[in-house]
């Protein structure tokens, strides 16, 4: 088990207002709002009904929005390197039961949100705790992940602090995580 991976991120902005809230758009995404403006959107939908929809939803990630709450400043589905999405976690060289898996480029399996263990918000910040399973090619879980994303406001010149941590637990066999710095761990991909 990897106890924690932590990735703090400070987002520049003009408004350090208070008043966080969380709103779930069931089976699609969860929004974190600050004074009525979207600051983050956790994209957790999983839909394997068509190849295109599966490609769009094969891993959960956190979008970060501009100071007006209108547009993501992080990359989403599509464009060049479609696997680069917001704030996400993965490895391109995973060994499990004698086979190699890629949960970076997402070939031969997915990372699937199972449920929220906790969502909360108050005047100081918001927190999302998500349980995910990292599947093999047969949709059998290899890894159980508890992903925690904490969002709070900070002093100027920044607007937000985002802490991303993950607890990973091997299921059924040992797991070896490997990859180069560009294809392993927690990453932030701007739009």
Residue locations for each model-derived region?
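Bacterial N-terminal signal peptides
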Residues: 1-8
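Residue-level recognition of well-ordered beta-strand positions that form the cores
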Residues: 37, 131-133, 146-150, 165-169, ...
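Extracellular structured ligand-interaction cores
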Residues: 27-29, 59-61, 125-129, 146, ...
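Extended, loop-rich substrate-binding clefts of extracytoplasmic carbohydrate-active enzymes
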Residues: 83-159
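Beta-strand-rich N-terminal accessory domains
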Residues: 15-86, 165, 174
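Short beta-strand segments
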Residues: 40, 141-145, 175
